[in-house]
Amino acid sequence: MTENNQDLKQNWTRHREGVVQAACGTQLTAKSWLTEAPLRMLMNNLDPEVAENPNELVVYGGIGRAARNWECYDKIVESLTQLNDDETLLVQSGKPVGVFKTHSNAPRVLIANSNLVPHWASWEHFNELDAKGLAMYGQMTAGSWIYIGSQGIVQGTYETFVEAGRQHYDGNLKGRWVLTAGLGGMGGAQPLAATLAGACSLNIECQQSRIDFRIKTRYVDEQAADLDDALARIAKYTAEGKAISIALCGNAAEILPEMVRRGVRPDMVTDQTSAHDPLNGYLPKGWTWDEYRVRSVSEPANVVKAAKQSMAEHVEAMLAFQQAGIPTFDYGNNIRQMAKEVGVANAFDFPGFVPAYIRPLFCRGIGPFRWAALSGDPEDIYKTDAKVKELIPDDDHLHNWLDMARERISFQGLPARICWVGLGQRAKLGLAFNEMVRSGELSAPVVIGRDHLDSGSVASPNRETESMRDGSDAVSDWPLLNALLNTASGATWVSLHHGGGVGMGFSQHSGMVIVCDGTDEAAERIARVLHNDPATGVMRHADAGYDIAIDCAREQGLNLPMIGR
């Protein structure tokens, strides 16, 4: 390391005590709602109710951060408070690098996180850059400032479990149970999603603090003392037809093989540990968490090797369940790839959740549409829930989701909601929300965004674009085009990331957020962005030859030159 690099490293801080929370109400810190919104959502990502490790700037997903370091965070906040409505802030891997004059309909913030030239797109190279303070892993919604806690993935997981139930169990999961692991920011959605889908679940987690948090927020119902206790509870509740979620503190790489040895038969098996990041997200069997964190710094190569070997045993157990006739699927954490790299040749024998259950929704531009109330008032979310029902009156499944969400989901940080809606519906809802702000029905503006896990915004051959009909799994032009189009359409902030969900070298993806501030100008931007964004998903799947997408494109009047209208 050069002397200059040493000086650079001494000038940044990853750990800082204190509490970050978004402001609420209508008083602005920034110059307008267009800059107040990204400021509040950045802070909301680091709210202790939202983030997994806010003192380290970690929001979720291993080391998915909101800013590169605390010095960068402070400068982002300062830049946003001073930003004018004809300027754009550029953020490079969590670091504010420039403010440029643009125009009022341009994004206020453009973000690029953890993008590497493909030949160098590996965890090894990224970790070198990260250690020098030259990069930041943004995951998907951590570095793009639109994470809303575990609710953000609950409905997607719920839709997956419901569709799996429809395919394998005649649409009825009563008396059935799901076996899974991981109760972090993403995996923490699984127990509640299973409950809402009507199934029991056994959720293995190696950190007691995560179990405590999921019980506190009502995502998990109970904790078992050990495996025997857990299986006894599962047997009792499934016999009674109750949908109860049970947590078990332990290591999935040890517990799943033991369940296979015992001949235990779940009704569904998946996994949402942070297997995408073996250095920071997957505990090797036989290790304590504290030992893992220390050795991750002192001997990273050995840690990665041990983690991948444990993943191999985990995946071999999942394969055994599948071979026993139990529906088994990867939930997008790249655990199959990690196992394959250390010798599990048939790791991909069980499918990913997108090709198995979700792709027909993507073909119609349906995906994780989300919004947050900048007022901090839950009533604003309840009013928007009612508006969704009013504007989409015939979708009983969606109405049922909204009712269950209100009853069961605890808000984390700023009140927010997610619901899976598609092309045509998103723009209709966004314009209605903007009008509610204009009329005063909502007490402050709302922001509308989505997960990067959406129909047109991601290239991820082991997850969202696995087994594409035309073989275009690894073509990453599509998320780049999505980001460019959202920028041209006037989204309030746009992000382009690499490595989210499945880790370095395995994905590229883009995100957008738009502010509904009640103005005519906002309405024009909303109409463009919330049409064009899901339309790219329909376009992408139509181009790959999916009839559902081609039909949707024709119904919606999309101008796709290579697809006859």
UniProtKB/Swiss-Prot annotation:
Q: How is the cofactor bound?
A: Binds 1 NAD(+) per subunit.
Ligand binding (NAD(+)): 61-62, 139, 185-187, 205, 210, 251-252, 272-276, 282-283, 331, 501
Its EC top class is lyase
Domain of life of the organism encoding this protein: Bacteria
Q: In which pathway does it act?
A: Amino-acid degradation; L-histidine degradation into L-glutamate; N-formimidoyl-L-glutamate from L-histidine: step 2/3
Quote the catalytic activity from the record: 4-imidazolone-5-propanoate = trans-urocanate + H2O
Catalytic site positions: 419
Query: Which terms are listed as keywords in the entry?
Result: Cytoplasm, Histidine metabolism, Lyase, NAD
**Keyword Cytoplasm recorded:** yes
Query: Which cellular component terms (GO) are annotated to the entry?
Result: cytoplasm
Q: Where in the cell is it found?
A: Cytoplasm
GO MF annotation list? urocanate hydratase activity
Compositionally biased spans, kind Basic and acidic residues: 463-472
Pfam families from the UniProt entry = Urocanase, Urocanase_C, Urocanase_N
Tagged with keyword Aminoacyl-tRNA synthetase: no
Which Enzyme Commission number(s) are listed?
A: 4.2.1.49
Biological processes per GO annotation: L-histidine catabolic process to glutamate and formamide; L-histidine catabolic process to glutamate and formate
Q: Which cofactor does it need?
A: NAD(+)
UniProt-annotated stretches for the region Disordered: 453-472
- Major localisation: cytoplasm
Q: Which HAMAP family does the UniProt entry name for this protein?
A: HutU (MF_00577)
State its role: Catalyzes the conversion of urocanate to 4-imidazolone-5-propionate.
Membership in a protein family: Belongs to the urocanase family.
What protein am I looking at?
Urocanate hydratase
